Swiss-Prot record:
It is found in: Plastid, Chloroplast. The keyword Methyltransferase does not apply. Residues 47-118 form the KH type-2 domain. Belongs to the universal ribosomal protein uS3 family. It comes from Cycas taitungensis. HAMAP family: Ribosomal_uS3_B. GO terms for biological process: translation. This is Small ribosomal subunit protein uS3c.
Length: 218
């Protein structure tokens, strides 16, 4: 039986970087790690709740966190930052307030920076969110996957692989559908493979979306 390994962890330190950048004493490590997860979840949930609609999606590629003694610096890499900074920046200010209220008062200063992703649909998280939004709006599976591959190809990628599992198009029996375009060398460590999993909440149940994107090779 084949054993599957997460392609991000497999390449960590080679073509993939850590999302959290800090050092902590052993007694504080677990608390800081949980706090990082809370920060990321708070940001993602805020974007989905306030910025996502039938015509657009949040477009978060990743959240990176750096800690110093009296400073927590958060970088939100987002494909469509205009959705967050419109209305004179009220969206970003409200987000900062929500994150600040969730943190420990002794953590010090909080700084949130918004970084625009140059090619949004070259990021698997953004592309998976697009697919989920289309499937939740009852767009056919074939049309959705075809459009997603077209958007990814516009980002100058070398290959993409998509897996969608569940009750596709409302069928009674769950199944798995695959789509692949170009090269996706999962066994090559020097190949820069980005990967994500994203659930889509449809009226027929939850669909699981997995995407692998091959960007370049070192």
């Amino acid at each position: 039986m084949g054993q599957k390994m997460n392609p991000l962890g497999f390449r960590l330190g080679i073509t993939q970087n850590h999302r959290s950048h800090w050092f902590a004493q052993q007694k504080n490590y677990s608390e800081d790690l949980r706090e990082d997860e809370k920060i990321s979840n708070c940001i993602v949930n805020y974007i989905r709740r306030h910025m996502r609609s039938s015509s657009n999606h949040g477009g978060i590629a990743r959240v990176e966190i750096r800690r110093k003694i009296d400073l927590i610096q958060v970088e939100i890499h987002i494909g469509f930052p205009n959705l967050l900074i419109e209305n004179r920046g009220r969206g970003s200010e409200q987000l900062r307030t929500d994150v600040r209220n969730m943190l420990n008062p002794v953590d010090g200063k909080l700084n949130i920076a918004i970084v625009k992703v140059a090619k949004p649909y070259g990021e698997p998280n953004i592309l998976a969110e697009f697919i989920a939004l289309q499937l939740e709006d009852r767009v056919s599976l074939g049309r959705t996957v075809k459009r997603a591959i077209e958007l990814a190809e516009q980002a100058d990628i070398k290959g993409i692989q998509i897996q969608i599992a569940g009750r596709l198009d409302g069928n009674e029996i769950a199944r798995v559908e695959w789509a692949r375009e170009g090269r996706v060398p999962l066994q090559t460590i020097r190949a820069k493979i980005d990967h994500c999993y994203y659930p889509a909440q449809t009226i027929y149940g939850v669909l699981g979306i997995k995407i692998w994107i091959f960007g370049d090779e070192k």
